[in-house]
């Protein structure tokens, strides 16, 4: 019985104790749980900052809900919900305070501009926690909203199943229904995000700014990412093959391989490969012809524009506009014979004494001067030498001049250089004014001079011609005003105009080299304006104008048309008469100079004297009779050197040739001496001297240096030297005749001819010519000359003598013997 009573189950009843939560929500603020709608498993997030390890499992929450359904009433359930809301709000406040703390920390780090690597890891963790807490708050809020609709359902179901459902070891029907309701709510509204817990990484300053910024679109990229993006873009561009550009290539007559590659923007190696395909082996520095260059360019896909080499000078061609033309001063050239008073006339016109500095009163080179008259008008005069050696210089002067003044001495009349000057002026088509000088001398005849001019078709105005003839006296300054008026009248009739605008151009009057100043060039500007710093090309010389000096020695900065100036800066000495032009840059000037040098070289080769076949045989055998006189000529100005060369090359050179090793402007140098020593040459200096070192070297090497100040003395001496080098002329001089009357045979001597001197004299050892019936049968020398038995040196006319010939005994009675001597005479050119 007792046993039965003990094992009898007790009836389930409600206790008096009140249902309560064992843990407060304060301890749950460190951790929150939510339901994954799909897997129905718990996703747990822990905060490292709070250090709480509290975890609420899904089973505990469900059991708690079951007990709540059994024991709690509606008021108790509402109280729970309010507590949950407070917990959610408290969690949000904690997260907000943490974010504000991090913001302050970031601002402090930004202002201090210091490294923040220790804070960067915490910041990343805080950012993740913030995201997690936001998700948790959203889930809690949604659960609360759903639970507000649950109490009514709970009350109904509690009444139906409160008594029926067993509670021990079982879940109540209300708990099951609540679980289903929660599952529906989770399926419909709550989707728990999947959160990955990664290892924290170090943050940079830019990342902090990005986390704290509100506008995600305005975030700045890190420098490393920008750098990586740029490198990626570069690699992308490098991997893409650039599109080839095809050009129009300008090809001259001759072009270098490297220049052709540059013109096409191709690699030199590619150009060389194309040349090899064409069978041409060339490197980058070698030149090829136009046709080959065109084939290479065409094969590479480029178009070709062929130009001639002479096209480089096209930049020098320019036309002046009519509205730019202005009146300019006339350029007057003074010509005439030696010592007729050309320089004295210029002295009188510009009131200077130039003639005093000229050797012997003879002008040695061209001078250009500008004279300003009383009314302000100007005249430019060019003085040319009167010696015949300067005919080329006079012809150049006639080409650049507007008016020619022919100076004729009233007491001397028309001479050779006067006629030559008239011919130059006529050939140039330049108006002529005749100035009859020295009318102050007694016993002069002006009419005779005018009549001589008529012979050369120079007819004065008084005789119906168009030439103005003005009698003057340069020494007494008579009628100089009339001469100036005549010049200005002719200039006005010609309407001389030029444009002072644009690049300058003109003519080289003279050039020289001066120690300490370099190359000095006298030029005459014909158009445009020349300024300091302009780059000019004159012949094959070029350079930048460094300094300009006028005819009075004053430095100027610009020169207008008809103004003669002396400039410094050319790299070489140009020739008198060369045209000069201003170009844009030094490259243009260099290209033009190189082109002109090639032309001059080709011309020199084409006109070089060719040796005859006989001369070549003589040289090959070593028996050449042609002699050479090597010379080195140095002068003070280029025009004088040219005049000397022109005169020397006119000398006859049949038996001897004049060889000019070197000619130039400037003093005699050591290199000139070395060249003269190596070639056994004579150095000729015209108005220049040798330096101390050059003199020492000349004495040591025994080099002959000769100085001259007058050109015709130099020419005469060179002519004499050449004549002395010629072989002498051998001439026969007849001295007598002998008639053979008897033949004697003498033992050990041979035949002796008894003779009678019929004419002249006979000398021992003289040359003889044996004639028989007026035919020469022997020519030799006398071996013996005796009178009776004595040897004598000579026998005169009317005396008898005995004679014998060397190595010849075929003599007969009646033969005639001519006696003569061989005389040598010096040859002259």
Curated annotation (Swiss-Prot):
Gene Ontology cellular component terms for the protein in this record: cytoplasm
Where are the residues of the annotated region G1?
336-343
Write out the GO MF terms: GTP binding; GTPase activity; guanosine tetraphosphate binding; translation initiation factor activity
State the UniProt keywords alphabetically: Cytoplasm, GTP-binding, Initiation factor, Nucleotide-binding, Protein biosynthesis
| Superkingdom | Bacteria
- Record CDD domains: IF2_eIF5B (cd01887), IF2_mtIF2_II (cd03702), mtIF2_IVc (cd03692)
**Where, by residue number, does GTP bind?**
336-343, 383-387, 437-440
Indicate the segments forming the tr-type G domain, all copies: 327-497
Which family is it part of? Belongs to the TRAFAC class translation factor GTPase superfamily. Classic translation factor GTPase family. IF-2 subfamily.
| Name the UniProt record assigns to this protein | Translation initiation factor IF-2
Tell me what gene encodes this: infB
């Amino acid at each position: 019985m007792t046993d039965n009573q003990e094992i009898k189950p007790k009836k389930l009843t409600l206790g008096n104790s009140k249902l309560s939560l064992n843990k407060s929500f304060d301890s749950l603020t460190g951790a929150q749980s939510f339901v994954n709608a799909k897997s129905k498993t718990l996703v747990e997030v822990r905060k490292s900052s709070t250090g709480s390890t509290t975890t609420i499992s899904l089973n505990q929450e469900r059991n708690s809900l079951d007990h709540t359904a059994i024991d709690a009433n509606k008021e108790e359930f509402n109280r729970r919900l309010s507590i949950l809301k407070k917990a959610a709000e408290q969690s949000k406040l904690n997260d907000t305070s943490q974010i504000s703390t991090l913001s302050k920390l970031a601002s402090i780090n930004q202002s201090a501009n210091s490294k923040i690597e220790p804070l960067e890891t915490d910041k990343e963790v805080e950012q993740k926690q913030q995201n997690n807490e936001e998700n948790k708050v959203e889930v809690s809020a949604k659960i609360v909203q759903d639970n507000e609709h649950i109490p009514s359902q709970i009350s109904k179901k509690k009444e139906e199943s409160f008594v029926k459902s067993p509670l021990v070891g079982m879940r109540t029907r209300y708990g099951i229904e609540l679980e289903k309701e929660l599952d529906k709510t989770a399926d419909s509204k709550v989707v728990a995000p999947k959160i990955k817990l990664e290892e924290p990484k170090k943050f940079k300053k830019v990342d902090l700014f990005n986390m704290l910024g509100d506008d995600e679109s305005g975030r700045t990229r890190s420098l490393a990412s920008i750098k990586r993006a740029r490198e990626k873009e570069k690699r992308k561009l490098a991997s893409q093959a650039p599109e080839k550009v095809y050009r129009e290539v300008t090809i001259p007559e001759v072009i270098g391989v490297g220049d052709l590659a540059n013109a096409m923007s191709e690699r030199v190696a590619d150009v060389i490969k194309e040349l090899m395909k064409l069978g041409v082996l060339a490197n980058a520095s070698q030149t090829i012809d136009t046709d080959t260059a065109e084939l290479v360019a065409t094969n590479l896909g480029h178009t070709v524009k062929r130009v001639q080499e002479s096209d480089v000078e096209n930049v020098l061609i320019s036309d002046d506009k009519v509205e730019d033309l202005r009146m300019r001063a006339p350029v007057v050239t003074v010509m005439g014979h030696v010592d007729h008073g050309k320089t004295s006339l210029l002295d009188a016109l510009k009131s200077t004494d130039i003639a005093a500095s000229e050797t012997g009163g003879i002008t040695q080179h061209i001078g250009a001067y500008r004279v300003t008259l009383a009314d302000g008008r100007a005249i430019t005069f060019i003085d040319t030498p009167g010696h015949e050696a300067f005919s080329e210089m006079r012809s150049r002067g006639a080409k650049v001049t507007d008016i020619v003044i022919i100076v004729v001495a009233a007491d001397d009349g028309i001479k050779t250089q006067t006629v030559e000057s008239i011919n130059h002026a006529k050939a140039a088509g330049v108006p002529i004014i005749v100035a009859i000088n020295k009318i102050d001398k007694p016993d002069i005849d002006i009419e005779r001079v005018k009549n001589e001019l008529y012979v050369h078709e120079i007819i004065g105005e008084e005789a119906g011609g168009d030439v103005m003839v003005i009698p003057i006296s340069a020494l007494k300054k008579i009628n100089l005003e009339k001469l100036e008026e005549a010049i200005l009248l002719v200039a006005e009739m010609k309407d001389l105009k030029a444009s002072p605008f644009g690049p300058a151009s003109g003519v080289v009057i003279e050039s020289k080299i001066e120690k300490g100043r370099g190359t000095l060039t006298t030029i005459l500007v014909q158009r445009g304006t020349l300024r300091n710093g302009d780059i000019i090309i004159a012949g094959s010389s070029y350079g930048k104008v460094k300094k300009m000096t006028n005819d009075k020695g004053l430095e100027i900065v610009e020169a207008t048309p008809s103004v003669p100036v002396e400039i410094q800066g050319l790299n070489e000495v140009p020739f008198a008469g060369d045209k000069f032009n201003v170009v844009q840059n030094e490259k243009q000037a260099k290209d033009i100079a190189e082109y002109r040098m090639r032309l001059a070289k080709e011309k020199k080769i084409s006109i070089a004297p060719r040796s005859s076949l006989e001369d070549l045989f003589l040289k090959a055998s070593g028996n050449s009779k042609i002699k050479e006189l090597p010379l080195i000529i140095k002068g003070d100005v280029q025009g004088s050197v040219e005049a000397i060369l022109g005169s020397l090359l006119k000398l006859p050179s049949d038996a001897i040739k004049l060889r000019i090793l070197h000619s130039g402007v400037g003093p005699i140098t050591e290199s000139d001496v070395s060249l003269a020593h190596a070639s056994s040459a004579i150095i000729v200096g015209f108005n220049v001297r040798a330096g101390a070192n050059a003199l020492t070297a000349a004495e040591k090497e025994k080099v002959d240096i000769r100085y001259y100040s007058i050109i015709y003395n130099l020419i005469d001496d060179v002519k004499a030297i050449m004549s002395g080098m010629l072989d002498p002329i051998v001439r026969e001089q007849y001295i007598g005749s002998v008639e053979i009357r008897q033949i004697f045979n003498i033992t050990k001597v041979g035949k002796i001819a008894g003779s009678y001197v019929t004419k002249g004299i006979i000398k021992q050892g003289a040359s003889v010519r044996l004639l028989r019936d007026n035919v020469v049968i022997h020519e030799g020398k006398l071996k013996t000359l005796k009178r009776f038995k004595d040897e004598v040196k000579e026998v005169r006319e009317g005396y008898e003598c005995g004679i014998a010939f060397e190595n010849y005994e075929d003599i007969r009675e009646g033969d005639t013997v001519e006696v003569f001597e061989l005389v040598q005479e010096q040859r002259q050119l």
